[in-house]
């Protein structure tokens, strides 16, 4: 059963905490926060910033943030009349390690492939992807990241034991950027990590693992930041992945183009832009 949406009691608890801590503003980032919850907070003279990638309800607050590429198609739902919508990659909030411009270098030959499938790997694709890569007749090492909620480690280790390639296994590392900078090519689920890879400039094959990712992934393909999208729920996802990876392994110019377009799209400054606008809204309120 899905958790219940936050109610009036939850908003009262939040308000009491804000008063106790002498806060001037509140940032709300949860699928459980509905319009009523946000309204209760905003009506108590606290500047409220809602972070939402679903656009599932109206927004009675001062700031709404969605950094996805297709965010402008989703939002027109202010009920207070004064909502500032911070939409698109310009406001995509990345970890601090991605704030500075990357020193990524696109090499003519792929020597390192990174595989990262999000926190849970919902289709348990990691073992099969590693086996698929091991079948390719290229000389590269593989860095595989298993998320904190994935249940594939045992099967992954079985693949590693039989692999012809060197496969390094990482379990929920705190810092991803270093592994991204080492990679010449990545395979990634279509969540936040994909945007981090684009910001770094690492050419990536994307796997759709949730329906709400489809439009933004299609938009990234249209921009040239991605070459193709593979559907994690499709029975043919592995042949599709193999075809895409093989194509990119042999096309240095395309990898260079994808790297440049990704870095042009994302400069890593989204969190700072949002923070500065939140501060100025609090100051002017």
What are these regions (language model features)?
Residues 194-239:
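Catalytic binding pocket for nucleotide-activated donors in carbohydrate/polymer assembly enzymes
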Residues 181-192:
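Acidic donor-binding loop of glycosyltransferase active sites
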Residues 228, 236-253:
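C-terminal "capping" alpha-helix adjacent to the active site of nucleotide-linked donor transferases
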Residues 108-183:
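Donor-nucleotide binding loops and adjacent catalytic segments primarily
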Residues 1-79, 85:
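Active-site and donor-binding regions of nucleotide-sugar-utilizing enzymes
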